[in-house]
Regions:
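Helix-loop "lid/cap" segments that line or gate small-molecule binding pockets
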Residues: 85-88, 96-99, 105-117, 192-197
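C-terminal peripheral helix-coil segments that are non-catalytic and often amphipathic
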Residues: 82-93, 134, 138-145, 164-168, ...
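N-terminal positioning helix adjacent to the helix-turn-helix/winged-helix DNA-binding module
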Residues: 3-4, 8-11
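Hydrophobic alpha-helical connector segments
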Residues: 53, 67-103, 155-162
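Helix-turn-helix
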Residues: 7, 15-57, 61
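Hydrophobic alpha-helical segments that form the core
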Residues: 103-112, 151-173, 185-192
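Amphipathic alpha-helical packing segments from all-alpha helical-bundle domains
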Residues: 99-103, 109, 119-146, 157
């Protein structure tokens, strides 16, 4: 992608995440990038095309560890560490690619907003979320069987609670460069949950 085209995607995607896709006009995008309408149409035929480029760029980075790696994780505590490491690596990669920090939940909200335009992205996010929930449930059951955590806890509820820890980042300003605070806060929340449930 050329530098200018990449800049259009990055600055437009930042606006889409902050204001919402429908709330952003082409004028807003022109203003953010300091380009004319003609320059936009040289690189992109529509606002939808810019959005698609941003979503594709984001999706090229997020994902989960392989099934083989997942099955080798021996404890819930270790799984939490793996999740944290993966989230930090993904966030660093996205920061380099977009020039701003993207909160995962903001991305998911954007995908939900544009699901009528791009239902395939909604399906992909739904699939990703279901897969993550399933893995949390698997690790919780394994931890119960191994005596790592309290067996009386509801597996499904605990899985949803642990999976939602990343939403604690909602109060962080989109685009913040202080990722270390975001991830230390997330790690602290995971640690507190773990202290409450371990045997």
């Amino acid at each position: 992608m050329s530098d200018l085209k990449d800049e259009i995607v990055n600055k437009s995607f930042f606006l889409f995440l902050n204001k919402g896709y429908k709330a952003c006009s082409l004028k807003d995008l022109e203003s953010a990038t300091r380009l004319t309408k003609g320059a936009f149409y040289y690189y992109f035929r529509s606002k939808e095309e810019i959005l698609k480029a941003g979503i594709d760029k984001y999706l090229s980075v997020i994902g989960d560890i392989s099934e083989t790696e997942f099955l080798q994780i021996g404890s819930l505590k270790l799984y939490i560490d793996v999740i944290m490491e993966q989230k930090e690596r993904s966030a660093e990669t996205l920061l380099r690619m977009f020039d701003f920090f993207i909160i995962e939940v903001a991305f998911f909200q954007l995908v939900l907003e544009v699901s009528s335009l791009f239902p395939e992205y909604r399906s992909r996010i739904d699939e990703l979320s279901k897969g993550r929930l399933s893995r949390w449930e698997f690790m919780i059951l394994k931890a119960k069987q191994q005596g790592e955590i309290d067996v009386t806890l509801d597996t499904s509820v605990l899985a949803r609670n642990l999976m939602s820890v990343s939403t604690s980042m909602l109060n962080i300003e989109l685009g913040t460069e202080n990722m270390s605070f975001v991830f230390s806060d997330m790690r602290m929340q995971f640690e507190q949950y773990y202290l409450l449930i371990k045997r």
